A protein has these predicted regions:
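Terminal amphipathic alpha-helical/low-complexity segments used for targeting or macromolecular assembly
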Residues: 1-59, 175-230
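Structural signal for interior beta-strand "rungs" in well-ordered beta-sheet cores
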Residues: 61-168, 173
Length: 230
């Protein structure tokens, strides 16, 4: 239990630049408080102490503005920033290392019992105000943009924006961006994040240079390997 608390606090420091001390985080961070109490509420729910779990969750909603149903399954190192207006439904499943921001809804689209809320795989980020509705699956490493409305499965590593949500960056594009950032770091240049909906001619030129440098590096490595052979 103490290891879990320590891990949750560490996540706040890693993902929230405003975090300054452990005491401040414990006393004033609503996301941390909501997640910590949810761990206990979920245990109560699994022990079939449904009323007690719901009452505790209701109190947390009153104090933090974050509504997490005690039946929701949440993985390790889950981070909630700001938190106000977040709703996480009963059959929601959230993997490890996910982050969500204020105003996010993981909601259902049916009155029928059973699986009716979203599944977020590992390393998913959901931006402020986004709505993910129904028993859809958001693939590992996906990014859901602010105020997007998602009602279908999203593949691993994709970036989604708009209403209804549509994919603007696929995993291959993400791999290329990561490659550029790694090259930029090597040469001491802090590249901006790539966004297809806001093209910057200077950034595009820099991206082309970084792509070319990467290609030259690969060719040089290939030449060196050939020269080493007898």
């Amino acid at each position: 239990m103490f290891e879990t608390i320590k891990e949750e606090i560490q996540v706040v420091f890693e993902r929230d630049p405003a975090a300054r001390s452990v005491l401040e985080t414990v006393l004033t961070c609503p996301g941390f408080q909501a997640i910590l109490v949810h761990r206990f509420n979920h245990w109560l729910w699994n022990q079939k102490l449904f009323l007690l779990a719901r009452l505790s969750a209701h109190l947390v909603r009153f104090l933090t503005g974050i509504e997490i149903h005690p039946g929701a399954t949440i993985g390790r190192r889950f981070f909630i920033d700001h938190g106000m207006g977040i709703v996480i439904g009963e059959t929601s499943e959230i993997g490890d290392d996910c982050s969500i921001y204020h105003g996010v809804t993981l909601g259902g689209t049916t009155w029928q019992k059973g699986k009716r809320h979203p599944t977020l795989e590992n390393n998913v980020v959901v931006g402020a105000g986004a709505k993910i509705l129904g028993p859809v699956t958001i693939g590992a490493g996906a990014r859901i943009g602010c105020n997007a409305v998602v009602v279908k499965d999203i593949p691993m590593g994709a970036t989604v924006v708009g209403v209804p949500g549509h994919i603007v960056v696929k995993k291959d594009d993400m791999d290329k961006t990561a490659q550029r950032e790694a090259m930029a770091k090597r040469i001491g240049f802090d590249a901006y994040a790539e966004r297809k909906d806001m093209q910057d001619p200077i950034q595009n030129a820099l991206d082309s240079i970084l792509d070319h440098m990467h290609k030259v590096d690969e060719e040089l490595s290939e030449i060196k390997d050939r020269l080493k052979k007898p």
